[in-house]
């Protein structure tokens, strides 16, 4: 650390101060660096071996001394303690306990004339006397502070006691906990420009509510004690094809919506050929969605081109196209002669399927507020492309999180007229109306609340990720559900699975994703599930456990397709952190030479597709494969035993969850902007 003409550094031999201009030693002080107490993992390992846990090494990649300089004092933090020394001669002024975050160095801050550390005590810099102690009420649902350093501004102490980003005012007793917003391990959040920036979230604690990606947040209410709220103000615009619905319903051989049906099963009852060849391939732009198929038409959107296409199912020729007011992030839904879809611009559209003429467009939010998302302007309340049809009602959600921008608005519309039948704002929930304290879930490091996603349903129960609804959009508790349903912990459209994300079949998102153990249910990167049988593709070990052999396991063995069957709920629900929800049995496992990006199933075949992961790959090869630079691979498998029937190669990688099956053919969207039809050879 440098202050004016003084440079101070800490080594294993002690604390040294030198002249910053010429390096001459001004003083040295022996400051012992005590070994850290053993970590939980080290203690457990020693216990298994019948040994006494020993202290950790002096330094590690995560924990090292902290130095902070003022004009006349140097503050040194080591393993949860802080020592103040004179910058002039190194004499000790005072020492005190300070605490430290999970597996991180001791924090020392100088703000508002005081010295602060993790214990929220403001000390006199010269004497160490505690002058002010901040109070913090919400310290969960996470069981420990995050594994990164805290931050401070001239007004707030920022820590992660709740597991997220918590603001504690330096004067008074104001507290603003945000357990739904954390940052990347080791990096921490960054307060700047009147905003809070956080990096990508790579964990599973509070995964149902935690913001993902790189975000910039600000206080939209203009008042730290008041929540930002919105109200629903429906606006319906009628087009030239208004009122002309009532066409033919989709058949069982079609694939009329995302993942075949509102259950999002990814399974069709139809059969396919067991040897395929390319029938046609067409370019639809830069970033196609998964396709859907109804009758003699294929519908697919160019996400970044804001354009929906209708293609001829026999030859791939374009029949019509329609440009929306924002990105279309997922495929449309066919319903009785109509095509319905949402956009990231915040609108929902209904088109006549035959020619793409507009029937109506709907927007339910009170203002057109735009933010920047991945380099493009879009609504603060975006709508996913895939609209769910249930009981002649079109359901969708507008928004991102129940803790952002006033919450998520959920709607149910008449698909023919666009008339609003049901609506609800989902915000928080918070403990009361007077302060913004989110409600903690009963266990497993979770919050009440949710993030927006493509809606699904099973029976009469509707789902938006972990949040359930009745058909009239009255919220339901997970423990009251009568059925299990397909759940994607990062969201259906998240195309970057990490070592702690998973898809599963359950009532709620749980910590651990069943650890990937059969008997505890499916937990792959993507899943096809028809209510009885499931097929899942894995590239990571679910639950982050390498089964059996730990670090000796060949990582390529993790890339597999698994199939199992569901045997009912059992006598009671397992509410542990590592659940066994229902009775599951393994059917077969087939190792694959690729990391899976998509899986779907027909009565007789299963197709899994992804990017190559081959023996001998270097780190550079692996990165290039994930970037789509090594093309794509698909395996056609026998649904009954997992036997490989055929390998297909593509010039480009398949898009995430980008396969449909209809009328005996497979339709695959690729990252080079093309759609491929594979039919009987």
Language-model-derived ranges and their functions:
Residues 1-681:
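Noncatalytic, solvent-exposed loop/strand surfaces
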């Amino acid at each position: 650390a440098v202050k004016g003409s003084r440079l101070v550094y800490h080594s294993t031999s002690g604390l040294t101060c030198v002249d910053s201009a010429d390096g001459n030693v001004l003083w040295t002080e022996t400051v012992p660096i005590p070994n850290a107490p053993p970590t939980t993992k080290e203690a457990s390992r020693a216990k298994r071996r019948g040994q006494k846990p020993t202290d950790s090494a002096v330094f590690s990649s995560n924990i090292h001394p902290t130095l902070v300089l003022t004009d006349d004092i140097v503050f040194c933090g080591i393993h949860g303690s802080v020592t103040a020394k004179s910058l002039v001669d190194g004499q000790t002024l005072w020492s005190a306990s300070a605490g430290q975050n999970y597996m991180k160095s001791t924090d020392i801050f100088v703000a508002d004339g005081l010295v602060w550390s993790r214990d929220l005590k403001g000390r006199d810099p010269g004497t160490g006397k505690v002058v002010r102690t901040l109070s913090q009420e919400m310290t969960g649902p996470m069981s420990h502070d995050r594994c990164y350093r805290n931050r401070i501004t001239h007004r707030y102490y920022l820590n992660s006691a709740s597991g997220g980003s918590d603001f504690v005012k330096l004067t008074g007793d104001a507290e603003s906990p945000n357990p739904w917003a954390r940052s990347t391990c080791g990096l921490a959040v960054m307060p700047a420009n009147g905003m809070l920036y956080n990096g990508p979230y790579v964990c599973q604690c509070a995964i149902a509510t935690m913001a993902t990606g790189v975000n910039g947040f600000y206080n939209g209410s203009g008042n730290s004690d008041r929540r930002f709220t919105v109200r629903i103000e429906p606006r319906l615009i009628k087009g030239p094809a208004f009122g002309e619905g009532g066409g033919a319903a989709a058949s069982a051989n079609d694939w009329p919506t995302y993942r075949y049906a509102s259950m999002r099963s990814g399974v069709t009852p139809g059969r396919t050929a067991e040897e395929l060849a390319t029938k046609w391939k067409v370019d639809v732009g830069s970033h196609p969605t998964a396709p859907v198929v109804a009758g003699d038409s294929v519908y697919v959107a160019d996400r970044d081109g804001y354009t929906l296409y209708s293609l001829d199912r026999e030859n791939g020729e374009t029949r019509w196209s329609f440009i929306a007011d924002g990105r279309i992030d997922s495929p449309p839904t066919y319903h009785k002669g109509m095509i319905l879809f949402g956009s990231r611009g915040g609108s929902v559209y209904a088109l006549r399927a035959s020619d793409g003429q507009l029937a109506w467009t709907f927007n339910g939010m009170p203002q057109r507020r735009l933010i920047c998302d991945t380099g493009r302007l879009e609504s603060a309340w975006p709508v996913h492309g895939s609209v769910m049809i249930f009981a002649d009602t079109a359901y969708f959600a507008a928004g991102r999180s129940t803790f952002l921008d006033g919450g998520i608005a959920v709607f149910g519309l008449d698909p023919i007229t666009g008339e609003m039948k049901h609506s609800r704002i989902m915000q928080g929930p918070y403990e009361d109306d007077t302060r913004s304290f989110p409600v903690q879930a009963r266990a497993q490091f979770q919050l009440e609340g949710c993030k927006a996603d493509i809606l699904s349903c099973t029976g009469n129960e509707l789902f938006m990720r972990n949040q359930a609804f009745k058909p009239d959009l009255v919220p339901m508790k997970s423990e009251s559900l009568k059925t299990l349903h397909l759940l994607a912990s990062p969201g259906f459209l998240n195309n970057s699975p990490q070592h702690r994300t998973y898809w599963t079949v359950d009532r709620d998102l749980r910590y651990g994703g069943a650890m990937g153990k059969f008997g505890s249910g499916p937990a792959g990167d993507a899943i096809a599930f028809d209510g009885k049988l499931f097929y899942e593709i894995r590239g990571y070990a679910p639950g982050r456990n390498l089964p059996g052999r730990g670090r000796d396991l060949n990582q390529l063995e993790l890339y597999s397709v698994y199939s199992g069957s569901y045997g009912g709920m059992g006598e009671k629900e397992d509410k542990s952190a590592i659940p066994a929800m229902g009775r599951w049995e393994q059917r077969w496992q087939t190792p694959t030479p690729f990391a899976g990006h998509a899986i779907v199933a027909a009565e007789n075949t299963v197709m899994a597709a992804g990017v190559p992961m081959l023996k001998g790959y270097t780190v550079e090869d692996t990165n290039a494969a994930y970037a789509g630079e090594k093309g794509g691979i698909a395996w056609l498998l026998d649904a009954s035993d997992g036997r490989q029937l055929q390998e297909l190669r593509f010039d480009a990688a398949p898009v995430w969850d980008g396969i449909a099956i209809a009328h005996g053919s497979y339709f695959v969207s690729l990252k080079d902007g093309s759609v491929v039809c594979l039919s009987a050879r």
